[in-house]
């Protein structure tokens, strides 16, 4: 709503406003019920943004907590709401016992209230669901262990758009209510002034839909959460009187008493009535947005209450004056916690909850509340702001927050890699604890005791890694929307915890789990410099591959080698297997070794690389001299069991002449790579700068040939956009190369096409071929089985092709990838993942705005791991899988656009910095193309395999000889009896960190937290979108499970004390607390 005033003096504005307030909008009829105002004191404390996390804590947060706690202790009428547990936990640990006891009393009195309770307020657009769960668990476990508190209210007031994932997860955490804020302002507000007129705006205002029952998931239709949208942001109330004719006379007055005193003057005897009138005017405007007579009114803002006295003292005067004049104002105000507001709303509207018995995971569903609207299966992307000056320039709202989906790509990539590494560390640490505890019970061996000391150190390292992972979920961290110094600090933290985990956690535990004798002083490393450091003929290296998924796996891996090195590869049974050496022209001509690796579920498999030739030397000349006294290897070699690897055929592809490349269908120019399931066909295209370009696909399973599909780099020219906002100046164009080069790699295992656009921009297409091994597993397919069913072949590396995209952007350029296929008529409908499930997107104009740059930006959506288009008639489907987030869209029929990297000279007013991304990341994607039914069977497992790669751990074997090595170490660690079924994902297996304080007993062992997810959506797959029934005892190998309890998602509430047999429906998730020991 907009107001126009006329006048030239500030004092005249005050008189005009005061007169207006006192005459009409303040008077209250005796027939009107009193408006109950729940004033919610709070401070929004970003976990990094304009300052680093450390700076915010030491310079701001400590002041806030110290002063607020002091104020609340002195005055029981005062209340405060706190969200970011990362700051509170640190502050709490810095306090003495006396102050801690005071805080406990404030919490008990409900003066100090925790809302949300996560480590931070995570971004909702591009943060992976496992990272969200982990950061919420961090906060919830601290609150539960220290205070017995179980948060019930979501508080996501600053992320740039609410996702359907968040209410789904929050409901599984036991939340009843949810508060959100940043949604498209054209949905919230009516813009109908002459100077800023947006047709159809303000539906929430018109229909009073600022509160609703949100049913976020079509796969879990009974999950719902009562949701409140902040009507006017989370800051202290203010009112702006807009003068469009004379903008300099626009007048804002508010109640942010730590803010600008000209706008937020302190309360005095002289201005008390006027200021009270203004606050009541704000209240009465806002209460009309709701369907009851209760108003949640935020009182605070970014890092507010550093001076809690000035905030509370000024507001005290207003509260006292307004409440004492209730007949005049019809308003009653009180300091409140967020739950008090919801309790009153529920009381007034008769909403109740009952247990939902229709699902396999325990949750509640609402009864009553018919007066509230219901929102189903919809999220609130893209968040859009409407700025007056921006509107005057473009005659439309053009601030679409779809840029941060792709901003600072390298940060997004490293963050996701760090989460994958943490996941491996958590699994390994849990198994090491189980085995170590069993050894200590059986044998008080000094070596085991030494390892227990290491486990404590390892635990501390993982705690720090977990904490940093939580920090990176913050809505200004992974988004790339913080200042450069803060972003650099995030990267520094990530690199430090990754280094600690890689160097001090994973190698030590892998060595421990593989040992079959007492621990040896043996050097395991996550770094393959031991291979790269001038290997000699006869050198032997072991590589132990760690699998963090609950499925047996068989897939291709790549290991870097020194140039001109020939090797032989042996598997865990010491049987020689095929391998291929490839020179990667997109990676500075570096040399890589490819071979197939098989690993058991959650297990480890060891492979051996033997240097057989360097610089054309050959080991066959004198075997005894090369391998010394390693009798086992000499025996294997002399009996012809070892063989050299199959070398790749490398050829540079010359440019074709213009006559032969003038037609995209010219057979003489077509170049093909493929396997037994498909071929990729490439041609030189004049319309694409005569670049070698993917032009068609042969489906050898369906006997369909030359199916049109193209892919190439595109670039947008920036138009005043920044790390938050995407505002391209027009449609994308094909990226123009500089002296391009093309290479083809052929071989029996892997084939590649590499296209070098520039020195720092390239694409490499990778196709894998089946291989036959002489091991007990004779296929490259990964197998799985249900409890009593035979193995089913489902996943293999021939089902997809990879594209390694190495990208860089010049100033005011935004680089992406465009796929196009005439065989898919998707009618501009596409699907993006929120991490757990696909959300349908439809290319459309918003609020009748067909401005070109808004049609582009407003139809880009966040992708966590999957984007796809399909043709429902032909059943053709194109699916792109990724292990990092970015923005994507379908702007034309049969088209998918992915936006990888952005760079702009525009200085966003808040950051006052350019978006200067000079990184050169490699972004790997998996591509599935073909029959829709076939793809839907396999896309979700393939996505998890991509996101959770095998981790290689290296060691030098030749120092002690291989026969001694295998006498000390097992080549396989297999903790599960059998692989999980492919629709069942083991999401979490981690050791409980701390007992609840009031139940603490050092003699009680800590339990283990475990989560399972049925990964298939309803109707995704006829074969796999089925309920799964399983028992944990059928899987854990040599471990004894004595107690299984179902809990909330963050393990702070027991739901079922006896959970032996588990049933999971499609896309259901269950959390368990188990007592387990080694047999």
From Swiss-Prot:
EC number(s) recorded for this UniProt protein: 3.2.1.24
InterPro entries linked: Gal_mutarotase_sf_dom, Glyco_hydro/deAcase_b/a-brl, Glyco_hydro_38_C, Glyco_hydro_38_cen, Glyco_hydro_38_cen_sf, Glyco_hydro_38_N, Glyco_hydro_38_N_sf, Glyco_hydro_57/38_cen_sf
Assigned keywords, A-Z: Glycoprotein, Glycosidase, Hydrolase, Metal-binding, Secreted, Signal, Zinc
Catalytic activity annotation: Hydrolysis of terminal, non-reducing alpha-D-mannose residues in alpha-D-mannosides
Keyword Nucleotidyltransferase annotated: no
Signal peptide start-end: 1-22
Chief site of localization: secreted
Any GO BP annotation: mannose metabolic process
Details of cofactor binding: Binds 1 zinc ion per subunit.
GO CC annotations, alphabetized: extracellular region; lysosome
Catalytic site positions: 158
GO function term, MF aspect, one: carbohydrate binding
Family matches, as Gene3D superfamilies: 2.60.40.1360, Glycoside hydrolase 38, N terminal domain, Glycoside hydrolase family 38, central domain, Golgi alpha-mannosidase II, Golgi alpha-mannosidase II, domain 4
Binding positions for Zn(2+) per the UniProt entry: 44, 46, 158, 475
Glycosylated position list: 60, 96, 192, 222, 248, 467, 516, 527, 589, 760, 769, 848, 872, 912, 1040, 1057
Localisation per UniProt entry: Secreted
Pfam family membership, one: Glyco_hydro_38C
Cofactor(s) required, per the database record: Zn(2+)
SUPFAM superfamilies: Families 57/38 glycoside transferase middle domain, Galactose mutarotase-like, Glycoside hydrolase/deacetylase
Record carries keyword Signal: yes
Family: Belongs to the glycosyl hydrolase 38 family.
Identification of the protein by name: Alpha-mannosidase C
Species per Swiss-Prot/TrEMBL record: Dictyostelium discoideum (Social amoeba)
Gene name in the database record: manC
